[in-house]
Amino acid sequence: MHVSNSKFIFVTGGVLSSLGKGVASASIGALLEGLGLSITLQKLDPYLNVDPGTMNPYQHGEVFVTEDGAETDLDLGHYERFTNTNLSKLNNITAGKIYNSVLEKERKGAYLGSTVQVIPHVTDEIKSMILKASKDKDIAIVEIGGTVGDIESLPFLEAIRQLQLEIGKENTLFIHLTYVPYISVAGELKTKPTQHSVKELRAIGIQPDIIICRSEVELPQDVKSKIAMFCNVKPENVISAYDVDYIYKIPLILKAQNLDKIIIDAFRLENKEPNLTKWENIVSSLEHLKDSVDIAIVGKYIKLKDAYKSLIEALIHGGIEHKLKVNMIWVDSENLNEKDLEHVDGILIPGGFGERGIEGKIRALNYGRTKNIPTFGICLGMQLMAVEFARNVLGFKDANSTEFDPNTSNPVIDIMEEQKGIENLGGTMRLGAYECLIKENTKAYEIYKENLIYERHRHRYEFNNKYKEHFEKHGFIASGIYPKKSLVEIIELQNHRWYIGCQFHPEFKSKPFKAHKLFASFIENAYIYKKERS
């Protein structure tokens, strides 16, 4: 097996899921980058899907798309937002991918007639993919999805146990994230769930070096000492990760408890102070916001906010840029009431799939267009901008997307030519970064201030160029084009304060210290609109 020169931090979770392992891993990445180290982050997901691309957003949350077109776990979004890493398909490995690869090798005779088993064949495949993703990096942070004790996680935990033996304890660090419940009636923090979780991990053969404790409140020293004694770690290696109003405070909270120094000492690296100035500036901005804007998000998955994770963060980034708090007004597109939009400063129509809630989104777009409210359509949102305009301005009353009405006589949105006849849904959309050429003398050019941009995509349907002339005659222009195939990437309405749709997902490239230009402009114009009305 390939031997890596990288150091490895393995992050596991215990007690319950959704504790924030992804944010913790990303925050550790931010600390290490502050020390000038090159890093990568990887998520190992124990589910049997090859990727999350076909999973219901209510079950899995958002699908995050990388530059190279991988459909990945939303935690990769945290990794990219908190660090300078540009991740790829190597950075999200699922049990489905592992078993798929093992079975393909077995069919090709790669195992020379051996009985194929979880150990060593599946665990070897996991180790191989971990090592491949860590190439040429100082430190690889590897998050294992799920909770210790889950049957699905066992091959992954066994693989990282073996890796420590193979590459040496001096090159590996195990961090276990647990939950310490606060019983408010008794005013007491309970450590027993953490003790049992670590006991379970040790039974597998893994002794955590550091325990990060999630809790509603900060852990006092006596609680940390108790956890340290029962879990066989140093007291200073018990880190309190308490609830905060903004996740961007977490790198500073970890730094305050010397997590960076603990990691440096464990790996015998040069001892120096991390440069966290940009994080201090972000937190300072969030604590000194001058005003707020109300943005309506008209969506169909609003019961689970994780379905829009990158979008939420990108709006916050746009707010940070202008020292504004962004109040998100969640509007169910299936039960849209125009009263929900009366007092908002901007309307955002996010991406999505399927017919449910479409007409509500179209009504919201009509409201934003006719009332001259800053309105932003992303992916499906852009497509519905075209449908609404075709119906209510161009007079094509049955205008639609062939996704929702295959027999419409005015398919202003149609399936892409190369998507026709594709039967497999997984991994077959137009995915990843593509170039977009922006026309000068347009709002898009004013925002980007450059002709050529690269943005990430996830779609099968596109604007039908047969209708482009009709639209442009009436002031709805295509200001961004994919030059190789003349695909419409950005549309904007002239004689409107801010009515822009994009076929790509700008939220995937926004960072707290560098808001995406479209989100920054949208929030800025929403605030101008608010000031004009007050």
Swiss-Prot record:
Keyword flag Transmembrane: no
BP terms from Gene Ontology: 'de novo' CTP biosynthetic process; pyrimidine nucleobase biosynthetic process
Q: Which residues bind ATP?
A: S18, L19, G20, K21, G22, V23, D75
Alphabetical list of InterPro entries matching this protein: Class_I_gatase-like, CTP_synthase, CTP_synthase_N, GATASE, GATase1_CTP_Synthase, P-loop_NTPase
Please give the coiled-coil regions recorded for this protein.
none
State where Mg(2+) binds.
D75, E143
Give, as one word, the top-level EC class: ligase
Q: Which residues form the Glutamine amidotransferase type-1 domain?
A: 294-532
Query: Which reaction does this enzyme catalyse, per its entry?
Result: UTP + L-glutamine + ATP + H2O = CTP + L-glutamate + ADP + phosphate + 2 H(+); L-glutamine + H2O = L-glutamate + NH4(+); UTP + NH4(+) + ATP = CTP + ADP + phosphate + 2 H(+)
Keywords on this record? ATP-binding, Glutamine amidotransferase, Ligase, Magnesium, Metal-binding, Nucleotide-binding, Pyrimidine biosynthesis
EC number(s) for this protein? 6.3.4.2
Q: Please list the residues that bind UTP.
A: S17, K190, T191, K192, P193, T194, Q195, K226
Q: Which residues bind CTP?
A: S17, D150, I151, E152, K190, T191, K192, P193, T194, Q195, K226
Could you tell me which residues belong to the region Amidoligase domain? Answer: 1-269
Q: How is its activity regulated?
A: Allosterically activated by GTP, when glutamine is the substrate; GTP has no effect on the reaction when ammonia is the substrate. The allosteric effector GTP functions by stabilizing the protein conformation that binds the tetrahedral intermediate(s) formed during glutamine hydrolysis. Inhibited by the product CTP, via allosteric rather than competitive inhibition.
Binding positions for L-glutamine? Y58, G352, L380, G381, M382, Q383, E403, R460
Family annotation (PANTHER family): CTP SYNTHASE (PTHR11550), CTP SYNTHASE-RELATED (PTHR11550:SF0)
What protein family is recorded? Belongs to the CTP synthase family.
Additional information:
CTPSs have evolved a hybrid strategy for distinguishing between UTP and CTP. The overlapping regions of the product feedback inhibitory and substrate sites recognize a common feature in both compounds, the triphosphate moiety. To differentiate isosteric substrate and product pyrimidine rings, an additional pocket far from the expected kinase/ligase catalytic site, specifically recognizes the cytosine and ribose portions of the product inhibitor.
Whom does it interact with, and what assembly results?
A: Homotetramer.
Name of this protein: CTP synthase
What is the native source organism of this protein?
Hydrogenobaculum sp. (strain Y04AAS1)
